[in-house]
Amino acid sequence: MAQSVPPGDIQTQPGTKIVFNAPYDDKHTYHIKVINSSARRIGYGIKTTNMKRLGVDPPCGVLDPKEAVLLAVSCDAFAFGQEDTNNDRITIEWTNTPDGAAKQFRREWFQGDGMVRRKNLPIEYNP
């Protein structure tokens, strides 16, 4: 039963934050790499604190052990200095997939009693 084992670690490149640079009158896209450094298959989902400004593609998926995925984090145009950006971040959530599950993401994996881990990547906006 996969759910009794806590999910292992993931690595992200960059490791601690995402930085966008001005000007903000056009859409920016920044790529981050997520690596499943554990020995089990995981399902992951990405959340953002500001759905209007920030997007992530693909927003969810499944990674085999040692597999990596490149995510495109996009920031839509906005009025820098006139909007609150202090709490902007993306959150990566991941959990072990059930034994024998197909390699297809399922939202239910996050709604049961299995352990879900999270990693926050704050967004920094340079003027």
UniProtKB/Swiss-Prot annotation:
Residues the record lists as N-acetylalanine modifications: 2
Cell compartments where the protein resides: Cell projection, Pseudopodium; Cytoplasm, Cytoskeleton
Pfam entry (one): Motile_Sperm
Transmembrane parts of this sequence: none
Tissues with expression: Sperm.
Domain MSP: 9-126
CC terms in the record's Gene Ontology section: cytoplasm; cytoskeleton; pseudopodium
Keywords per UniProt: Acetylation, Cell projection, Cytoplasm, Cytoskeleton
Domain of life the protein comes from: Eukaryota
Main function: Central component in molecular interactions underlying sperm crawling. Forms an extensive filament system that extends from sperm villipoda, along the leading edge of the pseudopod.
PANTHER family cross-referenced by the UniProt entry: MAJOR SPERM PROTEIN, MSP DOMAIN-CONTAINING PROTEIN-RELATED
Additional remark text: Around 30 MSP isoforms may exist in C.elegans.
Protein name, UniProt field: Major sperm protein 78
Name of the gene: msp-78
